[in-house]
Amino acid sequence: MAGQSRPDLIRIGQVTAPHGVRGAVRVYPTTDFPERFVTLKRVMIDGPDRAVGARFRGFVKNLVILELEGITDRNQAERLRGADLLVPREEVHPLPEGYYYDFDIIGIEVVDPDGRQLGRVVEVDHTSPVHDLYVVETAPGKRYLVPAVRRFVKEIDLETGRMVIDPIPGLLED
């Protein structure tokens, strides 16, 4: 996905297994807003060519139970195991100012305060217990981790596709 334009379809979940014998499926939510499934009416399965009606049935542990239009038995539901559930980009929940979806950040240009290009964000790393890290790849292919905090990230402009960072000495060195 790095370097590509932002996706038109956003993954909100992945089918993990059938639920019961009448075609319902268990879905692992890949969204920060699993409550979105409560009001979900339509979803695309693995791409824009297969849009179906969706009906929320409940939560079980960390999974969502959905009924999908046209899926009426366990065998049909089993064939969906591993399928991505997608929604149009316009249907994602708006975030508060200063918060961004990974798909908005990945691919944007990273510059220093003087406008000198430093690279592009190729990944957002969520493994730090303190804050996210932006993985910035330079033209020669080196990667650097930039903490996603105001001390380093001075500006993110999604319209221009630019992130301004103020790196401390040594942050971008070998």
Curated annotation (Swiss-Prot):
Gene3D superfamilies: PRC-barrel domain, RimM. It holds the Pfam family PRC_RimM. InterPro entries: PRC_barrel-like_sf, PRC_RimM, RimM, RimM_N, RimM_N_sf, Transl_B-barrel_sf. The keyword rRNA processing applies. Residues 97-171 form the PRC barrel domain. GO terms for molecular function: ribosome binding. It is found in: Cytoplasm. One of its GO terms (biological process) is ribosomal small subunit biogenesis. Keywords: Chaperone, Cytoplasm, Ribosome biogenesis, rRNA processing. It comes from the Bacteria. GO terms for cellular component: cytoplasm; ribosome. The keyword Kinase does not apply. Binds ribosomal protein uS19. The PRC barrel domain binds ribosomal protein uS19. Belongs to the RimM family. An accessory protein needed during the final step in the assembly of 30S ribosomal subunit, possibly for assembly of the head region. Essential for efficient processing of 16S rRNA. May be needed both before and after RbfA during the maturation of 16S rRNA. It has affinity for free ribosomal 30S subunits but not for 70S ribosomes. This is Ribosome maturation factor RimM. It comes from Symbiobacterium thermophilum (strain DSM 24528 / JCM 14929 / IAM 14863 / T).
